[in-house]
Amino acid sequence: VKTIGIIIFISLLAVGTVWAEDPPSKHYILNNGLSVYIQKRDHIPLVNIVFAVNVGSKDEDQNTNGIVHLLEHLILLGPTQFQTVDEINLEMRRHGAQFNAHTSHDLMTFELSLPAQYWEFGFNILKEKLFHLKLVQPQVDKEKEIIFEELSQHQEDPYALATYLAVEHLFKGHPYQQPVYGVRSVIEKATIEEIETFYKKYFVLSNCALAVVGDVDLAVVDNKIRQGFGHLGEIEESAAPLERDSKPAPPLKKTVKVERYLDINKAHVIFAFEAPPLGHPDQLGLDIINLILGKGINPLLSRALTRMGKPLAHNLQTRYIMMEYGGAFLIYTTMEPKKVNQVRMELIKFLKTLWNFNYSKEDYPLGQQSEVTDYLEAAKSQVKFSHQQFLESGINAALSYARNILFYKLHQDEIDGKREPYMVRVDKTTSADLRNTASRYLSGEKYVMVTILPDKKKGKKVKK
């Protein structure tokens, strides 16, 4: 067993706990390469198990975009070599288990929650689903139809469509430009042989991580993991090392403007900016700016887009997407179509002020500090509260641990000993730090702007 400094890294990437006392835990890498993290939480009789695989749309090309998503469906909803779909579903219900899966640009995750008394069943069924997959044509055809319906829904949802278009144009020339959900034409012609090839290539234990959080005995679960997953080393040893053309996303060369038309009543304008990847030192600053601009009761963007006491836009939101090799900062607005140009102009004008904005009361003379809004302190409090609230969910915590120990293994040399724990850095963040971050990423000089307008008959326009 190869041990690593996972606990240190967990605190670096904001997945460390802020409990009065850290829960008991174990962390290691098996000889076959599987990264493991176990944490005991006995205040609720539940066990949460997450298995993460380092495969996503970043590993596809134009001829395979959608196979990862299809594979996720087949593992989640399909049969195994030992049981039919109906038999598996019956056993899941009998044991009170909830099973789900997600695919992103970087990872595929499988999440299982169930009563603590049935934790062994959870391990057994998860292992069976992941490593004893049975691909049969009727199930493949069924899941394809489900995905086609998902794709249609996304094309008709202005929020989802705008996000896809923004990311596509922000990451031109990089695998991140490909949609996570895939392309219909690729999925339609995907064969069992192609799916199986993808499955065998990426479902090797050195490419995976396992996290367990809940009411468990650490030693007993540790032994179960070694017995259940340790013997799969023969598969790992026979597999060729994964070769990836892993590289940072190229910088955006110039502003891109995209217009689409849908059968909707309101207009939607979305701005997308390049942002730092997961684990980057600037991640924290943009986390806080994200809260200040678009979250909470009175986000700063609302103030910026208000004239004469009336809002120019509604449903203002911000979103920071962190990926392994790049990031995106998105600003969403909804408005009456006649206000589109005004909102675009006002938003860009406002973003150009963020480099010298007073985020903290410390930016003002002492006599004025009691009269101003301290955006920085409010955001810090929200970070701590949200962090604690997030980790109180065992499945959320397990998801974070699985994702981040896998990331740590890939980037250990870049991270070890180079940064203080996340919450320490939150407390130390200053208004000057936010101004520097805003200047670096949100200057408004280069961006992708997506506008979704209400008229589906006019087709599409792309301006570069």
Question: Which residue ranges define each predicted feature?
Answer:
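M16/insulysin-pitrilysin zinc metalloprotease superfamily fold
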Residues: L77-Q81, S113-K144, G296, Y320-F390, ...
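Non-catalytic beta-strand/loop surface segments
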Residues: V18-D59, Q81-E120, Q153-N207, H231-H280, ...
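Active-site SXXK
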Residues: N65-P79
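C-terminal regions of mature proteins
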Residues: A209-G214, T333, P365-S370, D374-K464
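Bacterial N-terminal signal peptides
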Residues: G5-V15
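PAPS/PAP-binding and catalytic site of the sulfotransferase fold
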Residues: L126, L210, V221-G228, L347-L351
